[in-house]
């Protein structure tokens, strides 16, 4: 069981992300599957995210993580984007990211939003 103080710190990091990026949710915990694609998955968040530095907004698919960053996350996120974009062509995902929520911060809540390139070839190479 995860201690409540670790859960609280991760939630506070999530709240800090929400304040910084002001996302507008299109979907949360949406199960993604399409008859033409041989895999499925559940996207944690899809919505409009505005970069606080550039003020540019993009439809972004985000997966929440509490562990380390791994290269395989790019495959997972690209696969989810592939399905989403097939299902919702009027609302194409143009960015994918992992939101890493840590419980180790001391003074103030922190998070890391790690963007990945969407790479459909990388996904196809996993199942071809």
Place the predicted regions along the sequence by residue.
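Metal-dependent nuclease catalytic cores that hydrolyze phosphodiester bonds in DNA/RNA
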Residues: 1-40
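Nucleic-acid nuclease catalytic cores
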Residues: 4-5, 30-127
């Amino acid at each position: 069981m995860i201690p409540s103080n670790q859960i609280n710190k991760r939630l506070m990091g999530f709240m800090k992300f929400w304040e910084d990026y002001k996302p507008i949710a299109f979907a949360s915990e949406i199960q993604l599957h399409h008859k033409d694609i041989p895999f499925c998955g559940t996207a944690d968040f899809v919505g409009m995210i505005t970069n606080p530095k550039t003020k540019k907004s993009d439809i972004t698919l985000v997966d929440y993580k509490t562990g380390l960053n791994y290269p395989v996350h790019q495959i997972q996120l690209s696969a989810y984007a592939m399905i989403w974009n097939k299902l919702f062509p009027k609302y194409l995902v143009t960015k994918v990211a992992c939101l890493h929520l840590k419980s180790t911060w001391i003074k103030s809540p922190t998070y890391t939003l790690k963007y990945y390139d969407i790479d459909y070839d990388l996904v196809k190479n996993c199942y071809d």
